[in-house]
């Protein structure tokens, strides 16, 4: 589905996107095994953990399966119900996930899937009186809108927003090792990740050498057909990117 929806190479989709989702699943299982409903604090007070209620979940297009698992699983595992709105650009992965949830035997209404454009559906979810919490992954502009709309009903909000993550490069490091790793990480998923190190802040004395290594590394990145196996990257998602 990711190959068709966003042009992610089949190898990367299987080995990174799907593998990351499985990693989240294993981590949540470990956490749940240790989770206690009642915890006695050092001062004698008792902390009681209870389900929040209905959670509104908005996921992005760039890591669709990973983000769906990251939001839906902990909500359901802790006794919450949820409404998932995937990116309108990558709805197929969410639809497949909904089928899996249904086949697993979850009662109707525990997991709900709604599709539509972010500014319209996302705003309606964020303002809805029956949703107690919003979780959003996407742009800073989108996160700002969710926070503003959720404030009308004093919802809890969690955000994971995109940015321009810098790498600091000093002259005394192993320049080739560091720059090759930075360029590879930046180009991963065709540069379409929230944590892509899209900036290098370089010490002036090694600037020319860093530029040379970075250019060579970028030139060596292969772009290929998403249907083909291999370490190449795929196309950009759309013209805006």
Each language-model region and where it sits:
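N-terminal alpha-helical segment of soluble enzymes
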Residues: 1-6, 20, 32, 205
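Short coil/turn segments at secondary-structure boundaries
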Residues: 1-4, 37-41, 193-195, 226-230
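Alpha-helix boundary recognition
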Residues: 3, 14, 26, 126-127, ...
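Short loop-beta-helix segment that forms the pyridoxal 5′-phosphate
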Residues: 8-17, 45, 113-115
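Long amphipathic alpha-helix in the N-terminal Rossmann-like dinucleotide-binding domain
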Residues: 10-35, 241
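Rossmann-like NAD(P) dinucleotide-binding subdomain of oxidoreductase/dehydrogenase enzymes
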Residues: 37-177, 230
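ALDH superfamily catalytic-core signature
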Residues: 133, 141-241
């Amino acid at each position: 589905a990711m190959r068709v929806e966003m042009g992610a190479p089949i190898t990367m989709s299987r080995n990174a996107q799907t593998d990351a989702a499985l990693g989240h699943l294993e981590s949540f299982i470990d956490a749940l095994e240790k989770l206690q409903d009642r915890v006695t604090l050092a001062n004698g007070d008792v902390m009681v953990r209870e389900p929040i209620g209905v959670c509104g979940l908005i996921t992005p297009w760039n890591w669709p399966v990973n983000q769906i698992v990251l939001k839906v699983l902990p909500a359901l595992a802790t006794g919450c119900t949820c409404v998932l709105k995937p990116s309108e650009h990558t709805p197929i992965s969410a639809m497949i996930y909904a089928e899996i949830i249904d086949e697993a035997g979850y009662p109707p209404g525990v997991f709900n899937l709604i599709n539509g454009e972010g500014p319209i559906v996302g705003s309606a979810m964020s303002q809805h009186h029956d949703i107690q919490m919003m979780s959003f992954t996407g742009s800073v502009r989108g996160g700002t809108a969710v926070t503003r709309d959720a404030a009308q009903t004093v919802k809890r909000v969690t955000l994971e927003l995109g940015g321009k993550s810098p790498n600091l490069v000093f002259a005394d490091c192993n320049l080739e090792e560091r720059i090759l790793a930075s360029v590879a990480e930046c180009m991963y998923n065709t540069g379409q990740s929230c944590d892509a190190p899209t900036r290098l802040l370089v010490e002036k004395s090694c600037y020319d050498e860093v530029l040379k290594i970075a250019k060579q590394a970028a030139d060596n990145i292969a772009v290929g057909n998403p249907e083909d196996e291999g370490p190449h990257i795929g196309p950009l998602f759309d013209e805006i990117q």
